[in-house]
Amino acid sequence: MAESYLLEKLKSVEQTFNELTRRLADPDTARNPDEYQKIAKSRSSLEEVVNTYETWKIAQEELIGARQVLKESNSDPELQEIAALEVNELEEKIKYLETRLKVLLLPRDPNDDKNIMLEIRAGTGGDEASIWAGDLLRMYSRYADTQGWRVKLVSESLGEMGGFKEVILEIQGDSVYSKLKFEAGVHRVQRVPATEAGGRVHTSTATVAIMPEVDEVEIHIDPKDIEMTTARSGGAGGQNVNKVETAVDLMHKPTGIRIFCTEERSQLQNKERAMQILRAKLYEIKLREQQEEVTSMRRSQVGTGSRSEKIRTYNYKDSRATDHRLGQNFSLNPVLEGDLETVIQSCISQDQQERLAELATSSAAG
Protein backbone atom coordinates (compact mmCIF):
# COMPACT_ATOMS: atom_id res chain seq x y z
CA MET A 1 0.00 0.00 0.00
CA ALA A 2 1.64 3.18 -1.21
CA GLU A 3 0.02 5.46 1.37
CA SER A 4 2.12 5.14 4.53
CA TYR A 5 -0.47 7.09 6.58
CA LEU A 6 -3.00 4.30 5.86
CA LEU A 7 -0.60 1.61 7.08
CA GLU A 8 0.02 3.59 10.27
CA LYS A 9 -3.73 3.95 10.78
CA LEU A 10 -4.29 0.21 10.22
CA LYS A 11 -1.57 -0.74 12.71
CA SER A 12 -3.15 1.60 15.24
CA VAL A 13 -6.63 0.09 14.67
CA GLU A 14 -5.18 -3.42 15.07
CA GLN A 15 -3.53 -2.44 18.39
CA THR A 16 -6.80 -0.95 19.67
CA PHE A 17 -8.69 -4.09 18.59
CA ASN A 18 -6.23 -6.39 20.40
CA GLU A 19 -6.42 -4.23 23.53
CA LEU A 20 -10.25 -4.36 23.47
CA THR A 21 -10.11 -8.16 22.98
CA ARG A 22 -7.83 -8.42 26.02
CA ARG A 23 -10.18 -6.25 28.12
CA LEU A 24 -13.19 -8.35 27.15
CA ALA A 25 -11.43 -11.45 28.47
CA ASP A 26 -10.70 -9.70 31.79
CA PRO A 27 -12.96 -11.03 34.61
CA ASP A 28 -13.24 -7.48 36.03
CA THR A 29 -14.90 -6.32 32.79
CA ALA A 30 -17.35 -9.23 32.85
CA ARG A 31 -18.50 -8.09 36.31
CA ASN A 32 -19.65 -4.75 34.87
CA PRO A 33 -22.33 -5.48 32.19
CA ASP A 34 -22.51 -1.85 30.95
CA GLU A 35 -18.74 -1.63 30.52
CA TYR A 36 -18.65 -5.07 28.89
CA GLN A 37 -21.34 -4.08 26.38
CA LYS A 38 -19.57 -0.80 25.56
CA ILE A 39 -16.23 -2.56 24.92
CA ALA A 40 -17.92 -5.34 22.89
CA LYS A 41 -19.61 -2.72 20.70
CA SER A 42 -16.33 -0.83 20.13
CA ARG A 43 -14.53 -4.07 19.28
CA SER A 44 -17.29 -5.16 16.92
CA SER A 45 -17.07 -1.83 15.01
CA LEU A 46 -13.36 -2.54 14.27
CA GLU A 47 -13.71 -6.23 13.42
CA GLU A 48 -14.21 -5.89 9.66
CA VAL A 49 -11.23 -3.51 9.32
CA VAL A 50 -8.95 -5.86 11.26
CA ASN A 51 -10.10 -8.99 9.38
CA THR A 52 -9.65 -7.23 6.01
CA TYR A 53 -6.19 -6.02 7.08
CA GLU A 54 -5.21 -9.60 8.08
CA THR A 55 -6.41 -10.91 4.69
CA TRP A 56 -4.38 -8.15 2.98
CA LYS A 57 -1.21 -9.09 4.92
CA ILE A 58 -1.62 -12.79 4.01
CA ALA A 59 -2.21 -11.88 0.34
CA GLN A 60 0.99 -9.76 0.39
CA GLU A 61 3.00 -12.76 1.70
CA GLU A 62 1.43 -15.03 -0.93
CA LEU A 63 2.28 -12.52 -3.67
CA ILE A 64 5.97 -12.47 -2.63
CA GLY A 65 5.97 -16.30 -2.84
CA ALA A 66 4.18 -16.39 -6.22
CA ARG A 67 6.59 -13.81 -7.70
CA GLN A 68 9.54 -15.89 -6.46
CA VAL A 69 8.12 -19.01 -8.15
CA LEU A 70 7.57 -17.02 -11.37
CA LYS A 71 11.17 -15.79 -11.28
CA GLU A 72 12.59 -19.29 -10.76
CA SER A 73 10.37 -21.17 -13.26
CA ASN A 74 12.05 -20.11 -16.50
CA SER A 75 12.79 -23.73 -17.45
CA ASP A 76 9.20 -24.93 -16.80
CA PRO A 77 6.66 -23.14 -19.07
CA GLU A 78 3.67 -24.87 -17.43
CA LEU A 79 4.70 -23.84 -13.91
CA GLN A 80 5.52 -20.35 -15.18
CA GLU A 81 1.98 -20.03 -16.60
CA ILE A 82 0.41 -21.14 -13.29
CA ALA A 83 2.63 -18.75 -11.30
CA ALA A 84 1.86 -15.83 -13.65
CA LEU A 85 -1.86 -16.51 -13.25
CA GLU A 86 -1.51 -16.60 -9.46
CA VAL A 87 0.47 -13.33 -9.41
CA ASN A 88 -2.25 -11.70 -11.50
CA GLU A 89 -5.07 -12.96 -9.24
CA LEU A 90 -3.26 -11.88 -6.07
CA GLU A 91 -2.55 -8.40 -7.47
CA GLU A 92 -6.27 -8.00 -8.28
CA LYS A 93 -7.24 -9.27 -4.81
CA ILE A 94 -4.81 -6.87 -3.09
CA LYS A 95 -6.10 -3.95 -5.17
CA TYR A 96 -9.69 -4.76 -4.12
CA LEU A 97 -8.69 -5.17 -0.44
CA GLU A 98 -6.84 -1.83 -0.43
CA THR A 99 -9.90 0.00 -1.81
CA ARG A 100 -12.07 -1.76 0.79
CA LEU A 101 -9.68 -0.77 3.60
CA LYS A 102 -9.73 2.87 2.50
CA VAL A 103 -13.54 2.84 2.57
CA LEU A 104 -13.57 1.20 6.02
CA LEU A 105 -11.17 3.84 7.34
CA LEU A 106 -13.28 6.79 6.15
CA PRO A 107 -14.54 8.81 9.13
CA ARG A 108 -18.04 7.73 10.13
CA ASP A 109 -20.88 10.22 10.16
CA PRO A 110 -21.68 10.56 13.89
CA ASN A 111 -25.40 10.65 13.03
CA ASP A 112 -25.44 7.40 11.04
CA ASP A 113 -26.82 5.25 13.88
CA LYS A 114 -29.58 7.70 14.79
CA ASN A 115 -33.34 7.44 14.36
CA ILE A 116 -34.91 10.16 12.23
CA MET A 117 -37.84 12.44 11.58
CA LEU A 118 -38.74 12.28 7.89
CA GLU A 119 -40.68 15.30 6.62
CA ILE A 120 -42.43 15.44 3.24
CA ARG A 121 -43.81 18.78 2.03
CA ALA A 122 -45.89 19.22 -1.11
CA GLY A 123 -44.13 21.64 -3.48
CA THR A 124 -45.23 23.04 -6.83
CA GLY A 125 -48.26 21.43 -8.43
CA GLY A 126 -51.25 22.18 -6.17
CA ASP A 127 -53.48 19.21 -5.29
CA GLU A 128 -51.36 16.85 -7.39
CA ALA A 129 -48.27 17.78 -5.30
CA SER A 130 -50.17 16.77 -2.13
CA ILE A 131 -51.18 13.45 -3.71
CA TRP A 132 -47.52 12.94 -4.71
CA ALA A 133 -46.40 13.64 -1.11
CA GLY A 134 -48.78 10.82 -0.07
CA ASP A 135 -47.22 8.47 -2.63
CA LEU A 136 -43.74 9.24 -1.25
CA LEU A 137 -44.99 8.57 2.29
CA ARG A 138 -46.17 5.13 1.16
CA MET A 139 -42.83 4.47 -0.62
CA TYR A 140 -40.79 5.27 2.51
CA SER A 141 -43.15 3.32 4.80
CA ARG A 142 -42.74 0.26 2.59
CA TYR A 143 -38.96 0.66 2.46
CA ALA A 144 -38.89 0.96 6.27
CA ASP A 145 -40.85 -2.33 6.48
CA THR A 146 -38.22 -4.11 4.37
CA GLN A 147 -35.54 -2.84 6.78
CA GLY A 148 -37.44 -3.91 9.91
CA TRP A 149 -37.76 -0.26 11.06
CA ARG A 150 -40.68 1.14 13.10
CA VAL A 151 -42.68 3.98 11.56
CA LYS A 152 -44.99 6.37 13.39
CA LEU A 153 -46.95 9.31 11.99
CA VAL A 154 -46.25 12.32 14.23
CA SER A 155 -47.69 15.31 12.37
CA GLU A 156 -49.88 15.78 9.30
CA SER A 157 -51.65 18.45 7.29
CA LEU A 158 -54.00 16.75 4.83
CA GLY A 159 -54.38 17.75 1.17
CA GLU A 160 -57.83 18.69 -0.09
CA MET A 161 -57.92 16.01 -2.82
CA GLY A 162 -55.94 13.41 -0.85
CA GLY A 163 -52.35 13.03 0.23
CA PHE A 164 -50.63 15.61 2.41
CA LYS A 165 -49.62 19.25 2.28
CA GLU A 166 -47.06 18.28 4.90
CA VAL A 167 -46.41 15.12 6.90
CA ILE A 168 -43.77 14.02 9.43
CA LEU A 169 -42.87 10.41 10.24
CA GLU A 170 -40.69 9.15 13.05
CA ILE A 171 -38.59 6.19 11.86
CA GLN A 172 -36.72 4.08 14.41
CA GLY A 173 -34.36 1.15 13.91
CA ASP A 174 -30.80 0.18 13.02
CA SER A 175 -28.75 2.85 11.22
CA VAL A 176 -31.81 4.66 9.81
CA TYR A 177 -30.02 7.97 9.13
CA SER A 178 -27.08 6.26 7.38
CA LYS A 179 -29.41 5.17 4.57
CA LEU A 180 -32.21 7.72 4.42
CA LYS A 181 -29.95 10.80 4.57
CA PHE A 182 -29.48 10.34 0.80
CA GLU A 183 -33.23 10.90 0.25
CA ALA A 184 -33.19 14.57 1.32
CA GLY A 185 -34.02 16.98 -1.50
CA VAL A 186 -36.61 17.66 -4.18
CA HIS A 187 -38.48 14.68 -5.68
CA ARG A 188 -40.14 15.51 -9.01
CA VAL A 189 -42.99 13.54 -10.59
CA GLN A 190 -44.11 13.66 -14.24
CA ARG A 191 -47.50 12.03 -14.83
CA VAL A 192 -51.13 12.58 -15.79
CA PRO A 193 -52.80 13.52 -12.48
CA ALA A 194 -56.04 11.87 -11.36
CA THR A 195 -57.39 15.45 -11.15
CA GLU A 196 -56.59 16.13 -14.84
CA ALA A 197 -59.50 15.62 -17.25
CA GLY A 198 -57.57 16.41 -20.45
CA GLY A 199 -54.97 13.66 -20.03
CA ARG A 200 -52.01 16.08 -20.05
CA VAL A 201 -48.78 15.24 -18.25
CA HIS A 202 -48.08 17.54 -15.28
CA THR A 203 -44.86 18.09 -13.35
CA SER A 204 -45.16 18.34 -9.56
CA THR A 205 -42.66 18.26 -6.73
CA ALA A 206 -42.37 17.38 -3.07
CA THR A 207 -39.46 18.13 -0.75
CA VAL A 208 -38.08 15.51 1.62
CA ALA A 209 -36.12 16.52 4.75
CA ILE A 210 -34.28 13.91 6.83
CA MET A 211 -33.70 15.04 10.41
CA PRO A 212 -31.66 12.93 12.85
CA GLU A 213 -33.22 12.79 16.31
CA VAL A 214 -31.37 14.92 18.83
CA ASP A 215 -31.59 15.30 22.58
CA GLU A 216 -31.89 18.50 24.59
CA VAL A 217 -28.16 18.59 25.28
CA GLU A 218 -27.28 18.78 21.56
CA ILE A 219 -29.76 21.57 20.73
CA HIS A 220 -30.69 24.14 23.37
CA ILE A 221 -33.93 26.05 22.81
CA ASP A 222 -34.66 29.20 24.82
CA PRO A 223 -38.24 28.98 26.19
CA LYS A 224 -38.61 32.73 25.41
CA ASP A 225 -38.30 31.87 21.70
CA ILE A 226 -41.36 29.62 21.82
CA GLU A 227 -44.93 30.75 21.26
CA MET A 228 -47.45 27.99 21.93
CA THR A 229 -51.22 27.78 21.54
CA THR A 230 -53.53 24.83 22.04
CA ALA A 231 -56.52 23.66 20.03
CA ARG A 232 -58.88 20.74 19.82
CA SER A 233 -57.52 17.78 17.89
CA GLY A 234 -59.29 16.87 14.66
CA GLY A 235 -61.43 19.51 13.01
CA ALA A 236 -60.90 20.32 9.35
CA GLY A 237 -59.67 17.30 7.44
CA GLY A 238 -59.21 15.21 10.60
CA GLN A 239 -61.10 12.67 12.64
CA ASN A 240 -61.32 12.15 16.43
CA VAL A 241 -62.56 15.62 17.30
CA ASN A 242 -61.91 16.10 21.02
CA LYS A 243 -63.67 18.34 23.48
CA VAL A 244 -60.34 18.74 25.30
CA GLU A 245 -57.64 20.95 23.76
CA THR A 246 -54.93 18.33 23.21
CA ALA A 247 -53.49 19.68 19.94
CA VAL A 248 -50.45 21.94 20.14
CA ASP A 249 -49.53 24.71 17.71
CA LEU A 250 -45.91 25.70 18.35
CA MET A 251 -44.03 28.60 16.78
CA HIS A 252 -40.25 29.15 17.01
CA LYS A 253 -39.90 32.93 16.69
CA PRO A 254 -36.24 33.24 15.53
CA THR A 255 -36.69 30.86 12.56
CA GLY A 256 -40.43 31.11 11.92
CA ILE A 257 -40.72 27.30 12.11
CA ARG A 258 -44.27 26.28 12.96
CA ILE A 259 -45.29 22.81 14.14
CA PHE A 260 -48.82 21.52 14.65
CA CYS A 261 -49.06 18.28 16.65
CA THR A 262 -52.28 16.32 17.09
CA GLU A 263 -51.25 12.66 16.97
CA GLU A 264 -50.54 12.06 20.69
CA ARG A 265 -53.26 11.51 23.30
CA SER A 266 -52.55 14.40 25.66
CA GLN A 267 -51.55 18.05 25.38
CA LEU A 268 -48.32 17.36 27.28
CA GLN A 269 -47.37 14.52 24.91
CA ASN A 270 -48.14 16.70 21.89
CA LYS A 271 -46.02 19.53 23.35
CA GLU A 272 -43.11 17.13 23.95
CA ARG A 273 -43.48 15.76 20.43
CA ALA A 274 -43.58 19.29 18.91
CA MET A 275 -40.39 20.21 20.82
CA GLN A 276 -38.75 16.99 19.61
CA ILE A 277 -39.61 17.86 15.99
CA LEU A 278 -38.36 21.44 16.48
CA ARG A 279 -35.02 20.21 17.88
CA ALA A 280 -34.65 17.87 14.90
CA LYS A 281 -35.48 20.69 12.45
CA LEU A 282 -32.98 23.11 14.04
CA TYR A 283 -30.30 20.41 14.07
CA GLU A 284 -31.00 19.62 10.40
CA ILE A 285 -30.58 23.33 9.51
CA LYS A 286 -27.22 23.32 11.33
CA LEU A 287 -26.15 20.12 9.56
CA ARG A 288 -27.22 21.44 6.17
CA GLU A 289 -25.12 24.59 6.66
CA GLN A 290 -22.09 22.45 7.54
CA GLN A 291 -22.68 20.15 4.56
CA GLU A 292 -23.07 23.11 2.20
CA GLU A 293 -19.66 24.38 3.34
CA VAL A 294 -18.10 20.96 2.64
CA THR A 295 -19.92 20.64 -0.70
CA SER A 296 -18.89 24.11 -1.89
CA MET A 297 -15.32 23.28 -0.87
CA ARG A 298 -15.57 20.01 -2.81
CA ARG A 299 -16.98 21.82 -5.85
CA SER A 300 -14.21 24.43 -5.83
CA GLN A 301 -11.66 21.60 -5.69
CA VAL A 302 -13.16 19.41 -8.41
CA GLY A 303 -14.55 22.31 -10.43
CA THR A 304 -18.08 20.94 -10.92
CA GLY A 305 -20.99 23.32 -11.44
CA SER A 306 -23.64 23.87 -8.83
CA ARG A 307 -26.00 20.93 -8.41
CA SER A 308 -29.72 21.39 -8.35
CA GLU A 309 -31.55 20.39 -5.20
CA LYS A 310 -33.62 18.11 -7.44
CA ILE A 311 -32.35 14.64 -6.67
CA ARG A 312 -34.80 12.36 -8.51
CA THR A 313 -37.45 12.45 -11.24
CA TYR A 314 -40.21 9.84 -11.35
CA ASN A 315 -41.50 9.57 -14.93
CA TYR A 316 -44.71 7.54 -15.20
CA LYS A 317 -44.96 7.56 -19.02
CA ASP A 318 -41.51 5.98 -19.43
CA SER A 319 -41.88 3.96 -16.20
CA ARG A 320 -38.51 5.07 -14.86
CA ALA A 321 -37.05 6.85 -11.85
CA THR A 322 -33.94 8.90 -12.69
CA ASP A 323 -31.50 9.70 -9.90
CA HIS A 324 -29.78 12.90 -11.04
CA ARG A 325 -26.83 12.57 -8.64
CA LEU A 326 -25.97 9.13 -9.98
CA GLY A 327 -27.01 9.82 -13.58
CA GLN A 328 -28.81 6.46 -13.44
CA ASN A 329 -32.28 5.17 -14.29
CA PHE A 330 -34.23 2.66 -12.21
CA SER A 331 -37.49 0.83 -12.92
CA LEU A 332 -40.31 3.03 -11.55
CA ASN A 333 -42.77 0.55 -10.02
CA PRO A 334 -40.33 -1.33 -7.74
CA VAL A 335 -38.99 2.03 -6.45
CA LEU A 336 -42.51 3.32 -5.68
CA GLU A 337 -43.25 0.02 -3.91
CA GLY A 338 -40.35 0.72 -1.55
CA ASP A 339 -37.59 -1.24 -3.30
CA LEU A 340 -35.02 1.51 -2.66
CA GLU A 341 -32.06 -0.53 -1.46
CA THR A 342 -30.23 -0.60 -4.83
CA VAL A 343 -30.65 3.17 -5.26
CA ILE A 344 -29.50 3.92 -1.71
CA GLN A 345 -26.48 1.56 -1.91
CA SER A 346 -25.45 3.30 -5.17
CA CYS A 347 -25.66 6.69 -3.38
CA ILE A 348 -23.58 5.35 -0.46
CA SER A 349 -20.98 4.02 -2.91
CA GLN A 350 -20.81 7.34 -4.80
CA ASP A 351 -20.44 9.26 -1.52
CA GLN A 352 -17.57 6.96 -0.49
CA GLN A 353 -15.82 7.47 -3.85
CA GLU A 354 -16.12 11.27 -3.54
CA ARG A 355 -14.71 11.18 -0.01
CA LEU A 356 -11.86 8.87 -1.06
CA ALA A 357 -10.97 11.28 -3.88
CA GLU A 358 -11.02 14.11 -1.35
CA LEU A 359 -8.79 12.12 1.02
CA ALA A 360 -6.30 11.39 -1.77
CA THR A 361 -6.22 15.10 -2.75
CA SER A 362 -5.67 16.30 0.82
CA SER A 363 -2.99 13.67 1.57
CA ALA A 364 -1.19 14.51 -1.71
CA ALA A 365 -1.28 18.20 -0.78
CA GLY A 366 -0.02 17.38 2.71
Swiss-Prot record:
Keywords linked to the UniProt accession: Cytoplasm, Methylation, Protein biosynthesis
One GO location term (cellular component): cytoplasm
Subcellular locations according to the entry: Cytoplasm
One example GO MF annotation: translation release factor activity, codon specific
Residues with the N5-methylglutamine modification: Q239
Post-translation changes: Methylated by PrmC. Methylation increases the termination efficiency of RF1.
Ranges annotated as spanning the membrane: none
SUPFAM superfamilies xrefs: Release factor
Pfam families in the record: PCRF (PF03462), RF-1 (PF00472)
Claim: NAD is one of the keywords in the record: no
Cross-referenced InterPro entries: PCRF, Pep_chain_release_fac_I, Pep_chain_release_fac_I_sf, Prokaryotic/Mito_RF, RF-1
PROSITE patterns noted in UniProt: RF_PROK_I
Main location: cytoplasm
Cited function: Peptide chain release factor 1 directs the termination of translation in response to the peptide chain termination codons UAG and UAA.
NCBIfam families xref list: prfA, PRK00591.1
Protein family: Belongs to the prokaryotic/mitochondrial release factor family.
PANTHER family documented for this protein: LD18447P, PEPTIDE CHAIN RELEASE FACTOR APG3, CHLOROPLASTIC
UniProt protein name: Peptide chain release factor 1
